Amino acid sequence: MSEQRRATTHLIGGFSGGLVSAIILQPFDLLKTRLQQDKTSTLWKTLKSIETPSQLWRGALPSCIRTSVGSAMYLTMLNSIRQAISKGKNTGSTGSSYLPQLNMYENMFSGAVTRALTGLITMPITVIKVRYESTLYQYTSLRYATSHIFRTEGLRGFFRGFGATALRDAPYAGLYMLFYDRMKVLVPTLLPSNVVKLNSDNRYSTYASTLINGSSAFSAAVIATSITAPFDTVKTRMQLEPAKFHSFTSTFWHIATKESVRNLFAGISLRLTRKAFSAGIAWGIYEEIVKKFV
């Protein structure tokens, strides 16, 4: 297969997985944003403020654009970096995946660098999405949201909170890739032997590999999300209240000392749920598309 077709396959796989997960899990993202914007809010109070079910999908369009395009870019770049690292090395792969296995440091490096680059490129969409989901801004359309940010803050406004985002996403992606690679080896040992039978090509069935990859992605996301949760809260505050919160350090210190350390983990249950299921869905779809067409 040509390199161009191989890259296209990774683009389509990443886009498809990201789009499906974004549509299904948008309500969790919206509730998380609103919980983080108000230090006194609770999940129950936030749910009561939702007037119609359709409001749970407010901000779905920028979320779908960011997640699908971001996922396509991320997974394509990630594969290129991982292939470059593994070139000339006998890295091998697991029975559920065609992706090369790397060591701990290579996994963390490839995930962190790729996520930071993708985050920078998709940052304007992220800022618009967060503001649109929030009740602090009464944006009536994405066009108005975009023009308002540009008019009041300039181009810099579209990259508000990038430092905190990079500090959250780069370690998250590095940790995620580390645990995901390890889980793909561990999960088959925990499943019934009749489920994880290898075929003549030393590969698992579509059902088994989807189960293994989805479960591995889910577990890896739970661990990585728990560790990086405070960075997400700081990032959201900086994007919602730029006049009050100017830097990562001052925002982190304000929340930890003026409010409570617990507030650094505001919305973690929703973020855990969304990130875990998002990873399970997106990587499950992505891995199967790559297996079918690469």
Swiss-Prot record:
Transmembrane segments: 11-36, 59-85, 108-133, 161-184, 212-238, 267-285
Subcellular location per the Swiss-Prot or TrEMBL entry: Mitochondrion inner membrane
Annotated membrane topology: Multi-pass membrane protein
GO BP of this protein: glycine import into mitochondrion
Catalytic activity: glycine(in) = glycine(out)
Gene Ontology, cellular component aspect: mitochondrial inner membrane
Signal recorded as keyword: no
Solcar repeats: from-to residues: 5-84, 102-186, 208-292
Gene3D superfamilies linked: Mitochondrial carrier domain
GO molecular function, one term: glycine transmembrane transporter activity
Top-level taxonomic group: Eukaryota
Keywords from the UniProt entry: Membrane, Mitochondrion, Mitochondrion inner membrane, Repeat, Transmembrane, Transmembrane helix, Transport
UniProt-listed Pfam families: Mito_carr
Main localization (coarse): mitochondrion
PANTHER family cross-referenced by the UniProt entry: MITOCHONDRIAL GLYCINE TRANSPORTER
UniProt family annotation: Belongs to the mitochondrial carrier (TC 2.A.29) family. SLC25A38 subfamily.
Biological function: Mitochondrial glycine transporter that imports glycine into the mitochondrial matrix. Plays an important role in providing glycine for the first enzymatic step in heme biosynthesis, the condensation of glycine with succinyl-CoA to produce 5-aminolevulinate (ALA) in the mitochondrial matrix.
Protein name: Mitochondrial glycine transporter
Organism the protein comes from: Kluyveromyces lactis (strain ATCC 8585 / CBS 2359 / DSM 70799 / NBRC 1267 / NRRL Y-1140 / WM37)
